[in-house]
Structures are given as C-alpha cells and as structure tokens.
Amino acid sequence: MIKETIHESQKCQRNWDLGQSIAEEDKKLIIESATNCPSKQNLNYYKLHVIEDRETIEKIHEKTRGFGPIYSDYNPDLREENAYDPEKTGEMYTNSQTLAQMLLAFTKNEEGLIQREEDDDWEEDRAMAVGIAAGYVNVIATQLGYSTGCCKCMDGSEVQDILGEQPILLMGVGVADKTRNRREHQTEDFMFPTLKKMKNIETTYV
C-alpha cells in the first residue's frame, strides 16, 4: 500500500468529479500535513490558503493559462529531441488541476523569520519548506484516496490580487474523475502530454 502510494502520488490529476466532496476529517488531516511538516528550525516560511469557494477557485484557475503549443507535439519517447521551443505559437490552455474540490495556495510569509545575518536570503529555505509541505499533502491525500496536482504556471500578480498575498504554489486536491484519462483537461478539448519516466536517480550506499 505504501509503495503504491509513492508511485500514485507522483501523478498530476487534470480533471475532477465535482459531484463528490472531500470528507471533513480527511480535509483536516490534509491541512495538518501541510502545516505541521518539517521546516528549517520550525520557522513559518509560508502561509496556507484553503480555498473551497467555487467562484474563487475558478477565478484563480483562469489565471493559470500558460500551457500550450510549446508542448503540443511532445513525444515522451524522444525527450531530448523535443526541447522546449519558445517560438511556437498557438492556443494556450489553463492548468485544470487547480479546479479540484479544494485548492491549496501557498503564499509568502515574511513574519517571524529570524534575521541571523544581514545578507540572509530566505528564498531557498522557503522553497524547500513549500516542497516538503506539498510532498506531505501528495502522500497523505493519496493514502486517503484522493488525487492532487501542483501548479506553478500562473500570472502571479493576478493571483496575488485575488489572494491578497504573493503566491508560491497552487495545489489542487480532490476526487478524480475515474471515467476520464487523468491527463484530459477538465473543461477544454486538450490532452496534457506526459513526460517519460527518467528518474533513475543515482543512489550511493556507504
């Protein structure tokens, strides 16, 4: 079960069965995983917005339009030959993983950080903390039977206008639509490409 969770939680869910809901106890546990995971010196590097209001979710979703022609003919078996091409033009699509039943938005927290040195830069520590939190959410949500999808592709200033704070990461959590391929866009006629598994991470045992 745990091994299956590890591999299943890697996948980004692009469509949702919005007729279903997340159980309240499950919701609390998922939020706890995002707010009580490890961080450097237990400092609060981020704030968490738990968004369930459908109108707000859809407003944020509209600000994630940025996936499109640069990947439209991507061949996962020819990864190196299909490099990102910024010159391609065409229709851009939103990132529909953000349309889940619950949208988590991680935003910057500047309060409570200890200034140890004049040149302290918290960006690396913050990125690490958010990454750990997202990983916790991925695993816990998957163990509870839900799916997830992270999104960094957004108009940050527009999302900030909605949230009132600078966004770092958006993360959809919810009930997958089991009648569809997980890569199908929720509302548009588009199939997101998938990248061939290339994570043969060198591991050294001492």
Regions found by a protein language model. Name each.
Residues 34, 104, 110-161:
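Small-aliphatic-rich amphipathic alpha-helix that forms the alpha element of a beta-alpha
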Residues 43-131:
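Glycine/small-residue-rich phosphate/adenosyl-binding loop
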